[in-house]
Amino acid sequence: GVVDILKGAAKDIAGHLASKVMN
């Protein structure tokens, strides 16, 4: 549902930010 989509997007954003910080 919509909540699952939002959770997935949040995880993707968090992953991108984390990868930028780690580099």
Curated annotation (Swiss-Prot):
GO BP annotations listed: defense response to bacterium; symbiont-mediated hemolysis of host erythrocyte
Tissue-wise expression: Expressed by the skin glands.
Annotated Pfam families: Antimicrobial15
Subcellular location: Secreted
Keyword presence, Secreted: yes
Keywords attached to this entry: Amidation, Amphibian defense peptide, Antibiotic, Antimicrobial, Secreted
GO cellular component assignments: extracellular region
Domain of life: Eukaryota
PTM-bearing positions, type Asparagine amide: N23
Function field: Antibacterial peptide that inhibits the Gram-negative bacterium A.actinomycetemcomitans ATCC 29522 (MIC=210 uM). No activity against the bacteria E.coli ATCC 25922 and S.aureus ATCC 25923, or the fungi C.albicans ATCC 18804 and C.lusitaniae ATCC 56936. Does not show hemolytic activity towards rabbit erythrocytes.
Protein family per UniProt: Belongs to the frog skin active peptide (FSAP) family. Ocellatin subfamily.
Name of the molecule in the record: Ocellatin-LB2
